[in-house]
């Protein structure tokens, strides 16, 4: 199967120009930005410069059901379709500490549009003020779509808080912009391979 390299380059280039907020493209030290915005901007620039198109072969023996690679260092999620016609690269949020980070092989076992959310017992222990349940909606931390992994409590999901993307900001899950999880949701299937490195 011939891989459409033009499409790959276009998707990656489009992502780089469209998903970088305007303030991230401006002068970091301008008087118009707050200290927090300056730090976020520096982080996004560093992360964006580390995005590289990857070949799937060093990570997977095949592309049966498609494959997702999450790189914790570059804070990027790579997706390859089973027929190799589609390769997408998305910025992501990753766990905020090594304690919350799980690495290894898993797979998508369930797909949910409009997911509800229940914090894990350890989340409630760390944050007793959090609700025990949250229905789908704009306050839901899982965003608009969720891919449930075979590991208990682990998901690839959207987020309504776009400040989290490109940062170590999650409690263990991998977060994407809602627009990106919507696209990834449509491309993946139950059984899609997942590797977190």
Predicted regions and their residues:
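Short, flexible active-site-adjacent loop segments at beta-strand->alpha-helix junctions, enriched
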Residues: 16, 74, 112, 153, ...
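Cell wall/extracellular polymer interaction/catalysis modules
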Residues: 28-122, 135-138, 145
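Exported/periplasmic cell-wall-interacting domains
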Residues: 63, 96-99, 103-104, 116-197
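N-terminal secretory signal peptides and thylakoid transit peptides that target proteins
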Residues: 1-17
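C-terminal segment of classical bacterial N-terminal signal peptides
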Residues: 20-22
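Generic hydrophobic alpha-helical segments
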Residues: 17-18, 84, 115, 180
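Short N-terminal micro-motifs specific to bacterial/archaeal maturation
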Residues: 1-2, 68, 172
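Boundary at the C-terminal end of the N-terminal hydrophobic targeting segment
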Residues: 24-26
